[in-house]
Amino acid sequence: MPNVNPAPIGVFDSGLGGLSVLREIRALLPHESLLYLADSKYAPYGEKPEAFVQARTLQACEWLLAQGCKALVIACNTATGHAVELLRQTLPVPIIGVEPGLKPAAAASQSKVVGVLATANTLKSGKFARLLASLDGESRFICEAGLGLVPLIEQGDIDGPDIRGRLDNYLTPMLEAGADTLVLGCTHYPFLSDTIRDMVGNQLTLVDTGSAIARQLARKLVEHDLAVAPGAVPQDRFVSTKDAAHLRQMAAALLHIETQAETVAIEPAPAF
C-alpha cells in the first residue's frame, strides 16, 4: 500500500546542478516530497580529491537520512562515480545515482562518434572507465573535461561570453572529429542546453539522463513499497551548506519556481 504520510526523497548535489534532476523528478512524481541538499560550501566536486568526494558524499547522505529521507538520489556525476557503491553498501535506503548517458548516445549516433562533456573527476572515475569499456567498439567517444563550467553555472551564467568561449573550446574538437551526439555528463550541464543548441544548431543531438533517473526512482519506490498515495500534497525543502539566498534565487532562475531555502551546517568536512 502506498504511504499516505510520505517521508521525503533526498536529492543531493555538490551545488545547483542537481536542480536539473529535481526538475525531472517533480515532473514525473508530482506528489512526492523532495529535500534538496546543495553542498555549495565545498562545490565543485569535479576537481576535488576522490577520497574527499567519497567521504563528504557519505557525510551528506547520512545527514539526509537523519532528516527522515526514504530514498536518495545522488544528483551529481562526480559523487556517483566515486561514492555510490560505498553508499549502497552502507546506507539502508534505495540509492539512485547518475551516470553519463553513453549507451543511449551510442545508440542514437549516426556517425558513431559521440562527444562527452563531463567533469575531470567523472572522466577519471573507475565507474566511467567501466562504462566506457562496456561500449568498446560501439562508438568512438571524444571526452572533454568541462573545466570552469560549473562555477559559472553556479553564478547563474548560462549564456554569457565566458561560458560560450569555454563551450566553443570543448565542442570544436568533437565536431571536427565528426561527433553528431553530445552526452551532458554533469547535472549542471542541462542548463546549458539552449546555449549549446544556439551555438551548434542541429549538428549535435544532446543526451541528458535526468528523465531516466526519475523513472528509475519511480521504479525503486514501487519496488520498496515507498511510493506516496496519489493526491498527497508534497512538502519540499531546499537547503544549502553555504548560501540559501543564492539557492533560492537560482531555483527561481533555472526552474522558475519560488521557494524558501535555508542554510545548514554539515561539519566537520573530511580532511584530505
From Swiss-Prot:
Top EC group: isomerase
Top-level taxon of origin: Bacteria
Sites where the protein binds substrate: 13-14, 45-46, 77-78, 187-188
Pathway: Cell wall biogenesis; peptidoglycan biosynthesis
A GO MF term: glutamate racemase activity
Entry keyword Acetylation: no
Alphabetical UniProt keywords: Cell shape, Cell wall biogenesis/degradation, Isomerase, Peptidoglycan synthesis
Active site: 76, 186
Entry protein name: Glutamate racemase
Source organism per UniProt: Cupriavidus pinatubonensis (strain JMP 134 / LMG 1197) (Cupriavidus necator (strain JMP 134))
Top-level taxonomy: Bacteria, Pseudomonadati, Pseudomonadota, Betaproteobacteria, Burkholderiales
